[in-house]
Amino acid sequence: DDGVPMSYHELFWKSELVDFVILQQDAFDDIDALCPIERQSYMLEMVLDICDKDYTFENYEECRNFFKEVINLLRQMNYSEFQSEKFENYKQQLTNLLSNGN
C-alpha cells in the first residue's frame, strides 16, 4: 500500500462508501429492505457530501479506519427508522466524526 498514492486509497474508500451505504440493501432487515424515495434522496445527498470533501491522512490505515467508521455509522442509520431518535443519534455521531476527522 505504500507504493500507491494516498489519493487512490481515498478514492477507493469513497467508492466503498457509495457501495456499502447506497447500492447495497439488506433484504433481511425490515427497514433497509424497503427504502422510500425521501430517505434514499436524503442518504444519497449525505454520502455525496462526504465524498465531495477532501481529507488528509497520514497513512493507509488511518484512511481505511476513518472510512470504515463512516460506513458503519451510515449503515446503522440505514437500519434505523428514518429520522427516529436512534437515526438522529447515529447522524450526530457521524457529524462529530466528520468534524473531528480529517
Residue ranges of model-derived segments:
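Conserved catalytic/coupling modules of large nucleotide/cofactor-utilizing molecular machines
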Residues: 1-102
